[in-house]
Regions:
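Acetyl-CoA-dependent GNAT
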Residues: 8-12, 18-84, 90-93, 99-104, ...
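Glycine-rich acetyl-CoA-binding "A-motif" of GNAT/NAT acetyltransferases
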Residues: 57-60, 119, 145
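Terminal substrate-recognition subdomain of acyl/acetyltransferases
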Residues: 144-163
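Conserved active-site alpha-helix within GNAT-family acetyltransferase domains
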Residues: 90, 116-133
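Conserved beta-strand-loop-alpha-helix junction that forms the acyl-donor binding cleft
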Residues: 111-121, 137-142
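Conserved GNAT acetyl-CoA-binding A-motif
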Residues: 102-112
């Protein structure tokens, strides 16, 4: 079995990230940014990009907002894989969580998921995220405000799950 590799993303990866964001159905679940927005995020010092590779082929990405913030809270802003349903997203998520907790002082990682996105929610729960509540109208997608289920994982729970 080939292993997945999580690597730090760079400006050279923007084309792949944008292509993945534009896969059918992803705009409604993941969102998408322009090239200028991605370049600005990469340059602002607040965001960290990660690419997941399988046999030297890019198959997914994640964007973390507030990487190494002084508040010690990181947000998984966006995460996606090119071919869902193969378990790669869950592996990407688990590796990303490990990376955040081992490379930063983060105490809490949180994310928002649309309540109807059962596949993503199951993956988040499998890695240890817990639902905290509904953030009403917190996401503006396709000209509509949408609710998001806030899920989070705190360092003590992550540490306990590793033992």
């Amino acid at each position: 079995m080939k292993t997945l590799q999580l690597v730090q993303g760079t400006a050279d990866d923007i084309a792949f990230v944008m292509a993945a964001e534009r896969l059918p159905g992803y705009e409604e679940l993941v969102g998408r940014w322009s090239e200028a927005q991605h370049r600005a995020a990469l340059a602002d010092g607040r965001h960290a990009y990660f690419i997941v590779r399988l046999a030297s082929r890019d198959i997914g990405f994640a964007i973390v907002r507030d990487w190494a913030s002084s508040e010690r809270v990181a947000c998984i802003k966006r995460i996606a894989v090119s071919n869902p349903g193969q378990g790669h997203g869950k592996i990407l998520l688990a590796d990303l969580v490990d990376r955040i907790f081992t490379k930063t002082d983060a105490y809490r990682i949180w994310l928002g998921v649309f309540p109807e996105n059962d596949r993503a929610r199951r993956a988040y729960e499998a890695v240890g995220f817990k639902a905290e509540g509904l953030a009403r109208g917190s996401a503006f997608f396709g000209g509509v405000y949408r609710d998001e289920l806030v899920m989070a994982l705190v360092r003590p729970d992550w540490s306990a799950g590793r033992n």
